[in-house]
């Protein structure tokens, strides 16, 4: 069975209750299904908190965090350090043998600078599956932060949805983007069950899909097109539904190629 990539985001990393529910669901799923799993994560809330403590400005452009040279080391520490090791500690609590990685390990993705105006913000593309396949075949759970490294050796902050998309392409994996919301919502706050590129363009033009959700939807559409299969956007808040979601049942918004 092809691997499943689960991207974690939102305030999940700040909530012990949410992490407990998530890892309990992961344990249940792994016991019932011999399917390779990969976790990909960002940690925007952790970064925002750290920036506030350090009195550094937080600037976002089109839903992406502007990352100047004097912040990339701090953001790397927050994502590849604190956020990644927090998830590893939860895996250990639940007897899951996990390995902490970033996008640069084993050349799993190829990362280039996205836009000079954004600073040290990268775009990830599919790379070599060798390292991840080796870990998965040995029964490990890779936990991958969204920090990338360019061919020139520069650290890059990559949007975690886009990072997960690139890794899904690397592995030919199914992809689930977990977030704070139950899926993509229409103008009345109701969940949209299915989303096409045409429908997404309409909702963006109408100002219903905005900011970070635009990045998330575009990443999901890119992944659905590249993989030739749907991608799910769903909430981590309903833990009892997560095993069904991991097993292919749509509980959020299903993005169609």
Curated annotation (Swiss-Prot):
GO terms under cellular component: cytoplasm
Annotated EC: 2.7.2.8
Keyword set, alphabetical order: Amino-acid biosynthesis, Arginine biosynthesis, ATP-binding, Cytoplasm, Kinase, Nucleotide-binding, Transferase
Pfam family, one: AA_kinase
Key word Nucleotide-binding present: yes
Main location: cytoplasm
Enzyme category, top tier: transferase
GO biological process terms, semicolon-separated: arginine biosynthetic process via ornithine; L-arginine biosynthetic process
Annotated binding of substrate, by residue: 43-44, 65, 157
Name of the gene: argB
The organism's place on the tree of life at top rank: Bacteria
Protein name as annotated: Acetylglutamate kinase
The organism of origin for this protein: Pectobacterium carotovorum subsp. carotovorum (strain PC1)
Oxidoreductase among keywords: no
Matches recorded under NCBIfam families: argB
Pathway(s) served: Amino-acid biosynthesis; L-arginine biosynthesis; N(2)-acetyl-L-ornithine from L-glutamate: step 2/4
InterPro entries in alphabetical order: AceGlu_kinase-like_sf (IPR036393), AcgluKinase_fam (IPR004662), ArgB (IPR037528), Asp/Glu/Uridylate_kinase (IPR001048), NAGK-NC (IPR041731)
Binding site for ATP: 180-185, 208-210
Location(s) in or outside the cell: Cytoplasm
Subunit structure: Homodimer.
Site positions per UniProt: Transition state stabilizer: 7, 216
Molecular-function GO term, any one: ATP binding
